Curated annotation (Swiss-Prot):
Transmembrane segments: none annotated. It is found in: Secreted. Residues 1-23 form the signal peptide. This is Suprabasin. One of its GO terms (cellular component) is extracellular region. The keyword Transport does not apply. Keywords: Secreted, Signal. InterPro entries: SBSN_GxHH_rpt, Suprabasin. Residues 153-175, 476-487 have a biased composition (Low complexity).
Amino acid sequence: MHLASLLSSCSLLLLLGALPGWAANNDPIEKVIEGINRGLSSAEREVGKALEGINNGITQAGREVEKVFNGLSSMGNQAGKELEKGVQGLNRGLDKVAHGINNGVGHTGKEAEKLAHGVNHAAGQVGKEADTVIQGVPHGVNQAGSDAGRFGQGAHHATGQAGKEAEKFGQGAHHAAGQFGNEAEKFGQGAHHAAGQFGNEAEKFGQGVHHAAGQFGNEAEKFGQGVHHAAGQAGKEGEKIVQGVQHGVNQAGKEAEKFGQGVHHGAGQFGNEAEKFGQGVHHAAGQAGKEGEKIVQGVQHGVNQAGKEAEKFGQGVHHGAGQFGNEAEKFGQGVHHAAGQAGKEGEKIVQGVQHGVNQAGKEAEKFGKDVHYAAGQAGKEGEKIVQGVQHGVNQAGKEAEKFGQGVHHAAGQFGKEAEKFGQGAHHAAEQAGKQAGKVAQGVHDGVNQAGKEAEKLGHGVNHAAGQAGKEAEKLGQGVHHAAGQAGKQEDRLQQNVHNGVNQAGKEANQLLNDGHPGGSTTQHGGAATTTLTSGASVNKPFMALSVLWKSVTSIIP
């Protein structure tokens, strides 16, 4: 009995001692805590991996962006050098044009002086048998005479008996001035050859006078002044052609009737009122302009259009940074395209940059694709930027003649078929005037701005660095996916990457703004040496592990 009670007591004690351990092993709270600990450890490892992946992705993105800017900087420097060479070539060409124009003007002066002497003699020695011009004309017109025919014949014989048959007044004046041609060329041709024979094919009177006189004066003096200067530069301010013709022929009166009026009365009193110069010369030349345009129109076309085939002068000057011929790329178009389009077959620089940097272009030839490869892939298929700029500036298209040849022809021939670049440059350099943009300004605007309508290069680069085209995924999204969709940190990551890219765009704009005034980006801009502004996010994770752990443990009591 005693033994049984002892055994029962021991069993009870053992049971009581085991109960706490059993209860402890089966405690659900402890299991929950252990599960939470294991979950937090696993979460910590996963978050660490995610943050490390994000950090690596951002670092890699920063390297790629830096490579892009290095490529853009190199491209900009090389392009600047090529553009500088192009500008130097333009300067040399313009110097040659200036020398050619000076020689042409000097020769024109000599010929004009000869013409003035000829006219002087023709006007002063009307004829030994004839009375003075004032008397001769009334007798010639009113007293028909035996040998006196029409006024054309009368003037013809009076000024030197240039022919036996009564040639028209245009021919008479042509021969009277020195028989500048064997066949009665049109008045425009006559004046053209009299001034120096600037062209093999007789250009119209407008062109003839334009080239003959050289457009003396900055603001292109009126036609009256032009003819006045061409005949001898009788005055500094150029008296009106009425006075010029009056004094040149005989000084028939003190006030000098207008040329139209003088010829009008001399030819037979075609009207009581002095007709305009265009009509006067038109009638005086024997109505040489039933087929030809009136002198007024001729002068207008000569200065503005240079004939129906020639572009209007306004367009010519506009295209003087614009378009000078149908076959050759007109100078304006040449310069504009040299910094903008480089011809129909050349890559348009503005579009090229925009497409090349933003959309990588659809065709491998375009300048934009060159920039794209030059900045990112060193141009495996696209031509190098050097070649692109070289072709754009120096050749302006395969069909356009080189600038040197153009200037050479410009100073020497002024083009037999198409108005060669020289003629265009002559118009652009000579008649640009104070109202037209100077050539230097035109080139400067053409190279640096490519027109007010063209987007600035900085704008293009900004889009290139910031958007990389509408079709390309944003850099922030790319890094986001590359890192593995970190989750709630996505917005902050995208924002930081966006800020970094925007800052890079600002640096690119600063680079272009720094390179803009000089016409070439020879100095290294900020984008070349600038690291990613969001470098803090590149070199360290967005949230430290210790901070994350504290935030997790703070929710556990």
